[in-house]
A protein has these predicted regions:
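Conserved metal-binding segment of the jelly-roll/cupin
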Residues: 57-76
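Short histidine-centered beta-strand/loop micro-motifs
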Residues: 19-24, 54, 73-75
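Cytosolic-biased juxtamembrane loops and peripheral soluble domains of multi-pass membrane proteins
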Residues: 46-58, 97-104
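Double-stranded beta-helix
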Residues: 74-115
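Short, surface-exposed beta-edge/turn micro-motifs
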Residues: 6-8, 18, 27-30, 79
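Short, small-residue-biased leader/transition segments that mark boundaries at the very start
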Residues: 1-4
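Glycine- and acidic-residue-biased ligand/ion/polar-headgroup-sensing regions
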Residues: 14-17, 24-46
Length: 115
C-alpha cells in the first residue's frame, strides 16, 4: 500500500499501563510530551548490553528513537499524553513486538519487566 512520508499518533498511557517492548524497523520515531506526568521511555539497541531510560517531560519534551531500536514506556503518574511521529510513515510490516520473538532471540540485557 501507500507509504506516507510521516505519520503522527496521540498516545495516552494510564498509570498502570505499559507500552511493551516494540520496534519500528522502517522509520525513526519522535516522541513529544503533551501533558500529564513525565513518561519513562526505555530504549535498547541490539548492540547494547542493557536498556537505557529517558524521562520525557515538560522539561525535556522531545526525544528521538532511531529505526531498529527497541522501545517501551510507562507513565510516572496518573497518565502521560505524548505524540509519536514516525518517518517514513508507519507500516505494520515494519513493526515488531518483542514478545513475539523466541526468548533466545531477545536482545542481551533487555529489561524483562517491560516484555
Amino acid at each position: 500500500g501507500d507509504v506516507y512520508k510521516r505519520q503522527t499518533v496521540l498516545f495516552l498511557l494510564a498509570a498502570d499501563d505499559v507500552s511493551r517492548w516494540h520496534c519500528v524497523h522502517g522509520g525513526d520515531e519522535i516522541w513529544t510530551f503533551l501533558g500529564g506526568a513525565p513518561l519513562s521511555l526505555f530504549q535498547h539497541s541490539d548492540r547494547a548490553d542493557r536498556s537505557s531510560e529517558q524521562l520525557v517531560s515538560a522539561d525535556q519534551p522531545v526525544t528521538w528513537v532511531p529505526a531498529g531500536v527497541w522501545m517501551a514506556a510507562r507513565s510516572q503518574g496518573d497518565f502521560s499524553l505524548v505524540s509519536c511521529c514516525v518517518g517514513p510513515g508507519f507500516s505494520f510490516d515494519d513493526f515488531e513486538m518483542l514478545r513475539d520473538r523466541a526468548r533466545s532471540e531477545w536482545p542481551k540485557g533487555i529489561d524483562e519487566r517491560l516484555i
